[in-house]
Amino acid sequence: MSNQVNSMNKGLTVKDLVTTGIFTALLFVFVLVGGVFFATNPVLTFFMPAGGGLLAGPIYLLLIAKVHKRWSLSIMGVIMGIIWFVTGMHWAFALGYLIMAIVADFVAGAGQYKSKKLNSLSYILFSIGGTGSYIVFFADPNGWAQTMLGNGTEQSYIDTMQATANTGILIAMFAAAIITSAISAFVGCKMLKKQFEKAGITA
């Protein structure tokens, strides 16, 4: 146990940072591919976090297996947040991923990055980060709309979102994000069994 803790607390090496960067790029692509269908539809856009969480689980878990040290997941969240922001997403979308990546880092770290259950929970929490923009939308729809209009979103898209939004959609958004990311984490654990055994990751 002491060896695992010492390994976790060691600083990130150049190799770790490069690996984190590569997997962050892959993760971004998988989240984008999973969520883009929903994002382009103002009625279905609330389920973008669910779509984004459906495919990326194996990539996320493999990153943990490759770099099981503190701050790798946080750095991933910073990079993804920056990418989302500069590509025109609402600032809360970027901030949501950043905050939840840090939370996810500490959750996975609680098991020294060796627990399948905590690593999977970590991924679920990370995926919930995609709800950040929508939380702000429900909390301050007018402010959200002004920001997105400034980012180039069409008024008709926003009008349809506002007409669709209700408490049921908000609950369904969170439930769907949790369910799809849990499925993705489960599939990832099955796909990466050999890699997990090599990295010492257990139940």
Model-derived segments and spans:
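Interfacial aromatic-anchored transmembrane helix boundaries in multi-pass membrane proteins
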Residues: G35-T40, L44, M80-A108
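Short helix-perturbing small/polar motifs within transmembrane alpha-helices
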Residues: V29, Y97-I135, A185
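Aromatic-anchored segments of alpha-helical transmembrane domains
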Residues: T24-L32, I79-T87, L125-I135
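Short, charged juxtamembrane terminal tails flanking transmembrane helices
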Residues: M1-S7, K193-A203
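Hydrophobic transmembrane alpha-helices
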Residues: S2-W71, I75
